Structure formats: structure tokens, C-alpha cells
Amino acid sequence: MSVTLHLRGETKPLEHRAALTPTTVKHLIGKGFKIYVEESPQSIFKIDEYRRAGAIIVPFGSWISAPRDRIIIGLKEMPEEDKFPLVHEHIQFAHCYKDQAGWKDVLRRFINGNGTLYDLEFLEDDNGRRVAAFGFYAGFAGAALGLADWAFKQTHKDSEDLPAVSPYPNEKALIKDIGKAYKNALKTGAKKPKVLIIGALGRCGSGAIDFLKKVGLPEENIIKWDIQETSRGGPFPEIAASDIFINCIYLSKPIAPFINYELLNKPDRKLRTVVDVSADTTNPHNPIPIYNIATVFNKPTVKVNTSSGPKLSVISIDHLPSLLPREASEFFAHDLLPSLEQLPSRHVSPVWVRAEKLFNRHSARAIRESKL
């Protein structure tokens, strides 16, 4: 059975990544897939790259009226104001399985249209490991912005916030830019920061470590924590004693907070910047309960209202890999490709069968809870 994929243009502001790259489009067409690609003004990839790869180019937003047998693939969630029923099979990150704000409304659109959601976050292999994730570049970009904010605080007044950031064409340009800010901060007499990473052994943590090493932070300044170190339960004074804290955990169940105001309001606190890569902002079990808004590239930080100690900011951008959209997209699409190749047999392929069962389970829960 041949499969037709329709790559929809992203609508989330400043989202420049793509679920399919020209490289993967060319590969899938070679396997017998038919692929439509929407014109997308914000994609890092030029439409001609897709055209040369063999895709059929269609107008932005045309997925809405596309034939029902097309599988619609995208990355981020659709605009909140859209309410029309979803009639297709969709592959995307929907952020609606962990009780996030508005999760029932998201699922209701699929239920009302008799559509199906294959959530990219929950495509897992037989060992329960995600088949594809942006974690590495989320950690890489998160560490970059965390160091940028720390450096900015050394060279600017507390009344100023880290200015807007824009995507970089490649990793080398990002390292050069943040490295320059870091060196300027050290010229003020500031000591090299200590960075504590929780979730250091995962994809995200390894990305954060990789950036910090490449920008020149000494190994001894990178404090790597994972399950063993956090097993005693928070809050952890070690976080307040670090200069930068990067949260890279995958939140799957309620846990004790990592940090609280009692630790933050001490006058000797060193912590200046928190990077919540996980960005479970609206999750009731968020282990960093010191902020309540997701930040954006245009305004990357939010100030924490502490009563003592130096200025403290949180970075909680939920699409950090978009700072390096081309490399992040290629990395992700490469890992996703083997699962996409199984789409012709998705009704028996374990990866897709599990994803559909999960969708059905949460849909039933949404219906049940809406009736309560």
C-alpha cells in the first residue's frame, strides 16, 4: 500500500524546523511514497530544495482541504484559536497527553473529526525508547542561552534583560557568538560559572554538555546529575549553589520540587540562570515551580520574584532546537526515517500501533472527564 504524506507549514511563531527535510523527502519518494510539501515562509529549508527532492509543492495551509487519505505531518501544535474537526491522520507533537493546559480541547478536535493523532513524543521502539527526539539540540541550545544570559548579567545592569535571539545558520556560528559573550563576561573579573545539569545522561543532557565543552567551559565546572544524584528527593541546595541550572529531565510522574523559594531567597545564593529545557510550564507537577510562563525567542527570560540575593531569570522556551533549525531538523528526521518507512504497514507496525492505542486511550479519558 502506497502512502501519501503532506508536510504542513508550521504556524508557531519563530518555528523554523521541519518534520521532513529535503533529504528525507528524496529518500521516501525513492521508497514509493508520494509527498506534498506546503510553501512555508518560516521554514529553514527553501521550497526549491523540496522541489529538487521530488516533492509536489502546494500552498500554505492546503492540508485542511486535502483528501482524507493523506497523512498530515508537521512538528508543533496548531494555532489554539483553530477549533475545526481534524479528519486526517496526523503526525506531530500535540502536547496533550500529560494534562497540559487545554489538552482535552486538542483531543476533542480529533474526536469530532474522527481523525487520528500519532504523537511524535510517544513514538517508541520495543524497549520504550523514543524513536526520534530533538533532545540533543534542545540541550545544546538551552546551554547556549543559559550561558548567554549568565554572561549578559556580568556585563549589564539588573534592569536590563537578555535581548531577543534569532536562529543561527549553523552550530559554528552559535558557538562563536556565545563564546564571544562568555569571554567578555570573564574580562569583568567574573569566575567561570558552575553549571549543574539534571538529566545529564540523556539526549538533552549530552547536548548541554557538548555545547559547554565546545565553548570552553572546564570539565570540572560541569556538574552532571542524573537519577542516582536526585534519588534522595528535592529540593536541592546544590542548585542554589551553582551559577546556572539546566533541567533536562523527562517528566513522566509527580516528583518533589528541585528548587524552592526558601533556597532562592538566601542572600548567599549563587544561582543566576535557570534553563528549563523540559519546559513543562503548565504541568501541575513541574519540579521548578518558580515561574508560570513559557518564554520565547523574542523575550527569552522571565525574572523570578526573589526577596534576596542577585537577579535570577528562567529560560523556558519550548522549542529550543529551533535555535539551530537546519541541523536539528536533519538530526530528528534521520532518526524518524525508519519509522516513516513503516507507514504502509502502520496498522500492524508496533511503533504506529502503540501510538494509535495511546491516542485512543487518552481520547477516551478526555471524553470521560468532559462528562464528569
From Swiss-Prot:
A motif (Microbody targeting signal) lies at residues 370-372. Pathway: Amino-acid biosynthesis; L-lysine biosynthesis via AAA pathway; L-lysine from L-alpha-aminoadipate (fungal route): step 3/3. It is an enzyme of class 1 (oxidoreductase). It catalyses: L-saccharopine + NAD(+) + H2O = L-lysine + 2-oxoglutarate + NADH + H(+). InterPro entries: AASS, AlaDH/PNT_N, AlaDH/PNT_NAD(H)-bd, Lys1, NAD(P)-bd_dom_sf. NAD(+) binds at R129, G202, R203, D226, T230, Y250, V277, I317, D318, H319, L320. The active site is at K76 (proton acceptor), H95 (proton donor). Pfam families: AlaDh_PNT_N. It is found in: Peroxisome. L-saccharopine binds at R17, K76, Q100, R130, F134, S278, A279, D280. One of its GO terms (biological process) is protein import into peroxisome matrix. Disulfide bonds join C204-C248. One of its GO terms (cellular component) is peroxisome. GO terms for molecular function: mRNA binding; saccharopine dehydrogenase (NAD+, L-lysine-forming) activity. Its EC number is 1.5.1.7. Monomer. Belongs to the AlaDH/PNT family. Catalyzes the NAD(+)-dependent cleavage of saccharopine to L-lysine and 2-oxoglutarate, the final step in the alpha-aminoadipate (AAA) pathway for lysin biosynthesis. This is Saccharopine dehydrogenase [NAD(+), L-lysine-forming]. It comes from Candida glabrata (strain ATCC 2001 / BCRC 20586 / JCM 3761 / NBRC 0622 / NRRL Y-65 / CBS 138) (Yeast). The lineage of its organism: Eukaryota, Fungi, Dikarya, Ascomycota, Saccharomycotina.
